[in-house]
Amino acid sequence: MITTIPKSINVTTIPLSGKILIEASAGTGKTFSLTILYIRLLLGITNHVKYKKGLLIKEILVVTFTEHTRAELEIRIKTYIKIFKTACIKKYSNNYVLSKLLSKITDFPKTIDILSKAENSIHELSIYTIHGFCYKILKLNKFNSELMLQNKILKHTYPLYLKISIKFWKYYFAFLSLDITSILLEYFNNPKTLLKEILPLLNKTQLISKLTKTKRKNIVQEYYILIKKIKLFKQKWANYSHLIHSEIIKTNVNKRIYTKSNLKRWINNITAWATQKQTKNFFIPSELKYFRYSFIIKKTTSEKILDDKFFKFIDTFLDSKFSLKEIFIIDASLEIKAMFMQEKIKNRYFEYDDLITFCWNMVNKNNFNISQTILKKYPVALIDEFQDTNNKQYNIFKKIYKKENLLILISDPKQAIYSFSGADITSYLQAKSNIKNQYFLDTNWRSSPKIINSINLLFSRLKNPFLTKNITFYPVKSSRINKTTKFEVNGKNQPALRFLLNKNKNISINEYKEWISITTAKYISYWISSGIKGNATITISNKVRTVNFSDIAIIVRNNLEAKTIQLELTKLNIQSLYLTSKNNIFQSKEILEILWILQAILNPNIERLLKRAMSTNIMSKNTKEIISIPNNHSYWIKLSQEFNQYLIFWNNYGILYVIQQLIINYNISNNNNLLHNFSPNIKNILYIGELLEEKSITIKNKFLLINWLKKNITQDFYLTKPKYIKPNYEKNNYIKIVSIHKSKGLEYPITIIPFATITFNKTVSTVEKICFNLNNTKIKKQKTLKIEKHKFSEDIRLLYVALTRSIIHCSIGISLAQTITQKKKIQKEKSKFKINVLRYIIQSGKNHISTKKLYTELSILKKNKNIEIISEIPNIIKKNFQIPTLNTNSQSLMHYQVSRKFNYNYNFTSYSQLKKNIKPSTMYSTLNTKKLFELNVKKKHCFENKILTPHTFPSGKIYGTLLHKILKNISFHKSINSNWLLKKLSEYNLDKRWCLILKNWMYSILYKNLDKNYNLRLSKLDSKNYIKELKFLLPIKKKLTALKLNNIFQTHQCSSLENKLCFHPIQGILSGSIDLVFLWKTKYFLVDYKSNWIGNSNQSYSQQNIKKIIKKHHYNFQLQLYSLVLHRYLKQHIKNYSFYNHFGGTYILFIRSINEIPSQNGIFYSIPNIEIIKKLEQIF
């Protein structure tokens, strides 16, 4: 361990070698500093000989932890390369840091040339998320690359976990008695609530691994042990209860608590419980605590109770843990995780975090070779947001970048708030302790001097504000450029921090929430209305402008807090948007109403459906009107005509047009308002219309479209791909409400933190205790206090993030009440942290809950001119400043911009659909009616005589599909499962006698020598070297016409089409799948199976005959398309790919003719025409 005092950093001069840790407080220019270091490495402005020549853009590795940050870094690096190049051309920059960097340049033409080359190769930027980097590294290894291709990424684990939890729930409870089941159902009433509790543990693989090694208790045995304890106690109480009253009276116990009536009632209640015939659960009367030895001693002046043995026994009894929750959680976690892993292996899934595990295993086991390969590819690495790392992630980089190899770690441990997603502050602190070169950024470039000084004051009053030894708070300096930054209302300069103080000492949590929400709404209303009049202004960079909606952000913890605030804002006509909200449109109230209306449009003559549609809030008909529909004939006709008209609109103009007409006809206004819970939301309705319009491109059948909608409504939220509501507000017309976690990295001129005085993390959960115990096996005493400290420390970091979002002003809600939280029972281990984090910081870390102490500390803070304490809300703020309502009713629909542009000719098509449109006159020109009749007679005769051969196997599309399924599912190396095959025959209503014929037929196909020169047989293919049914999508670049394709094939006679293709122009995507792609002796081949019936003998499948069939059915066109797919795939995956060296050719296997007879009948081999492929590439 290295003890280091971090130094203030100058990013233009810092030596660049070895491991470097840079801690960057909020607003200190972390990303800008990273870009300067990047440019230095690019230009070789470094003291280290190794990097003096400069590095290529692809050699500088940048890793971060979220896709959003990755994208931001990419933009910033691109921008500053361009900016610095311009500065080099001018030999001047008004940016202080860039001007310092310019002074380091000795050869400007060379520098400009390097930066120009960097700009030209900007697409080679090596910026990744941690998962993206691990994936890239794994692909360096051929074996892992194949592994990645074979497995499927499991993007969302919750649906699979939920499915497994339901399965676990069923079998676990099946073997438990009703009594134990009843106890467990008190903890969790269904699999979802269980999964919600254990999910954090399931996501921590290392802890699960540790848990498997611990000794597990049997839940049934533990139940009977605890029941036995309770029975024993009951027996002792029954024996001793008649003496308890007299023993208590003998002591000098507090008579105001232990009154005669209280004693009598308590003893009677406990005795009634103790004398019950049966003991089935863990219920213990709450009155028993009054007879604990420890409790009585506190309430008496006596030194000793006369006979204390029984009272001490009560103490011991109540200290026992009468719960099966922990055992159940451990059982559930281990079983569900084991089943989850089985499913992953079975379905060949891998999670994003598996990439990190795979990468660590590879680097750790094959350390030197792979590390050298990575070092050669990326000589330096910059890791952003390093505080969000964990042990495994850091160890990967530690293994690769040893000794003098440059590894720059940029972080802010004060903003480490993502423990729920796997980040581990302990890992960060451990890594920090091993790094010698530590620096910190000392200037805040974001906020006003007043905000900076106020936050410095708050956190500097504590020696260790974050409760963790190595998380140090360094006061930051303000930048001169922000000296004039200010917020004024009616000519009065607003303070940096304003504490909105509620002086009611007995306020409840709901009362406080209501009070602070109203106060927040009124302040915002006052600022906005003053801004509209020009009386509220913001000055940033010497530019003055009026306060607008977009300047204000309310920072909350969760969705409930956001809704509480939104309710009060709505009352004052203030639109707001919770930016963290993920409301699934399929769970909205409007979606079901749209479904009912569309069902009625498709069935306008069904009274039931029509009535249901009219009952919706969208159509808003009252009960009387709905009931009268069948009796009022003229109204019924009118209504039917209206719905028929909607159907015509749907057919002619699309479903979105229908929904727009509904909004106009029924005058739906924009009630995007929490006060109108039953009013339809116009923006939700239009968004639903957009989704349906988009889906109708691929689902043309209206009834199938309705079924798709119904399925998405009824399916579990987590088991379907959610479509999140995207409000269409103008940027400047709403107040932003954002969660603390989502606000990290963002900035706002004015912020309000209404609920900071409410305790964040209230109680320690069972899962948290299990996780802590597994991580801290050496700690044996006061574990709960340790967990509390850990949680409290994270809460302080959350508060720090919230406070540092502001540029000019921050209002914070606070109360004098002892604690604003729900009343909870006192824990057995007395909590050290009695107050919330805001009070803890204000009170300089003093853990007092007295009102007087808080008021004293606030008075001290008030002396600072940048801080204001408001306990009486000014009268001018109390006035209701109504913000003008925006015109968003149905008549303004003409100005509404639909967020999607629809191309109604855009479609999915396939080879089969294209060839379907061949002109009928040419399609059957070679087969006359007489010939067709003769063929059918022959086939019928074969079946009548019951001769079972591949030639007599039923023909047609259905049976062709069956043959393809069999070939897809059978192994090329193992025997065919007869039971499975019989099941398939049954599904297709075929005689079971076909089973043996089919098995032998399939073996003939697998063992057939396709090429005598190569001795090529499917049975000889290695399972790693082939893919069955390779699905593909080919985007059509421009409009596809039959003429284009016909011209391409016409110019190449060897591939010409016998019949011209004929179809309507198409835009969209061509989809399909290739039956088999395989690698054989360095070359790649594709196979297409054909089950066409040509004749009842092998001679019918001669090369001459099958060539005719291929031309007639456009199979040569199909082969060229498939060849294009394989050609493009190989180009992307093989370095130095050559068509002539790597593309082996194509096979069409007419499988009815393939048997043990040594003949090439039915086997068509060709090498595709590369010129046609090149021309097709211009289309697809």
Swiss-Prot record:
Function according to Swiss-Prot or TrEMBL: A helicase/nuclease that prepares dsDNA breaks (DSB) for recombinational DNA repair. Binds to DSBs and unwinds DNA via a highly rapid and processive ATP-dependent bidirectional helicase activity. Unwinds dsDNA until it encounters a Chi (crossover hotspot instigator) sequence from the 3' direction. Cuts ssDNA a few nucleotides 3' to the Chi site. The properties and activities of the enzyme are changed at Chi. The Chi-altered holoenzyme produces a long 3'-ssDNA overhang and facilitates RecA-binding to the ssDNA for homologous DNA recombination and repair.
Protein name, entry field: RecBCD enzyme subunit RecB
GO cellular component, one term: cytosol
Amino-acid positions noted as binding Mg(2+) in the UniProt annotation, renumbered to this chain: 964, 1075, 1088
InterPro entries from the UniProt entry: DNA_helicase_UvrD-like_C (IPR014017), DNA_helicase_UvrD/REP (IPR000212), P-loop_NTPase (IPR027417), PDDEXK-like_dom_sf (IPR011604), RecB (IPR004586), Restrct_endonuc-II-like (IPR011335), UvrD-like_ATP-bd (IPR014016)
Binding residues for ATP: 24-31
Domain UvrD-like helicase ATP-binding: 3-448
Cross-referenced PANTHER family: RECBCD ENZYME SUBUNIT RECB, UVRD / RECB / PCRA DNA HELICASE FAMILY MEMBER
UniProt similarity note: Belongs to the helicase family. UvrD subfamily.
Keywords: ATP-binding, DNA damage, DNA repair, DNA-binding, Exonuclease, Helicase, Hydrolase, Isomerase, Magnesium, Metal-binding, Nuclease, Nucleotide-binding
Cofactor: Mg(2+)
Cofactor: how bound: Binds 1 Mg(2+) ion per subunit.
Active-site residues, Swiss-Prot/TrEMBL: 1088
Region feature DNA-binding and helicase activity, interacts with RecC, mapped onto this chain: 1-852
HAMAP family recorded: RecB (MF_01485)
Ranges for domain UvrD-like helicase C-terminal: 478-745
GO function terms (MF aspect): 3'-5' DNA helicase activity; ATP binding; ATP hydrolysis activity; DNA binding; exodeoxyribonuclease V activity; magnesium ion binding
Residue span of region Nuclease activity, interacts with RecD and RecA: 905-1180
EC code: 3.1.11.5, 5.6.2.4
A biological process from GO: double-strand break repair via homologous recombination
Reaction(s) the record says it catalyses: Exonucleolytic cleavage (in the presence of ATP) in either 5'- to 3'- or 3'- to 5'-direction to yield 5'-phosphooligonucleotides; Couples ATP hydrolysis with the unwinding of duplex DNA by translocating in the 3'-5' direction; ATP + H2O = ADP + phosphate + H(+)
Source organism phylogeny: Bacteria, Pseudomonadati, Pseudomonadota, Gammaproteobacteria, Enterobacterales
PROSITE patterns: UVRD_HELICASE_ATP_BIND, UVRD_HELICASE_CTER
Subunit field text: Heterotrimer of RecB, RecC and RecD. All subunits contribute to DNA-binding. Interacts with RecA.
More info: In the RecBCD complex, RecB has a slow 3'-5' helicase, an exonuclease activity and loads RecA onto ssDNA, RecD has a fast 5'-3' helicase activity, while RecC stimulates the ATPase and processivity of the RecB helicase and contributes to recognition of the Chi site.
Entry note about domains: The N-terminal DNA-binding domain is a ssDNA-dependent ATPase and has ATP-dependent 3'-5' helicase function. This domain interacts with RecC. The C-terminal domain has nuclease activity and interacts with RecD. It interacts with RecA, facilitating its loading onto ssDNA.
